[in-house]
Amino acid sequence: MLIIGIAGGSGSGKTTVVKEITRQLSGKVVVIPQDSYYKDSSHLPPEERQKINFDHPDAIDFKLLCQQIGELRQGKTIEQPVYSYITCSRSATETITVEPAEVIIVEGILVFTCKELRDQMNIKIFVDADDDDRLMRIIVRDIEQRGRTVATAIDHYTETVKPMHLQFIEPSKRYADIVIPQGGHNKVAIDVIAATIERALHNQ
């Protein structure tokens, strides 16, 4: 089994990279998204939940994430939490059953900020992209998926996304074994990474 960490800023193309690697390694990959492991905030009033900074490492339940990655490594099945951005809370009744696989991809903007999690990874990949390109993708995503206007999306980027990127995400790039420039558009890099993973599996 290989544990692959894929990090990078919001809108960098991580999802595209993960999808392409998963496609090339058909049937061998399970993806564990960081976004499923935000801390449960159901005990907070709704107005307090809206103030949560999802781009800060403190928002992530790294203890549970590390525990479940360790369980997958041991060949155990896990019950992955289900988190709702709408209610800012973890489902009390629903989980996703995840079986072990040859390749476990742990994906998210903050996955390199936790040493305990990094230490479980065999390969660490950072997806890099131009700030302007990331901003455009973030605005489109926030409007289409999170109900924001252009103005509120830009405000969110300026007040939260960019400062957290500079403070936590960009510095975590130094932990990467591989940096993919041009984000999800870099087909050559993605092909090389998929081939490298295949070789590593073969050599285990």
State where each predicted segment sits.
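Post-Walker A helix-loop "phosphate-sensing" segment adjacent to the P-loop in P-loop NTPases
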Residues: 23-32
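Conserved nucleotide-sensing/catalytic segment adjacent to the nucleotide-binding pocket
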Residues: 30-31, 39, 43-87
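ATP-dependent NMP and nucleoside kinases share a basic, alpha-helical "lid"
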Residues: 91-146
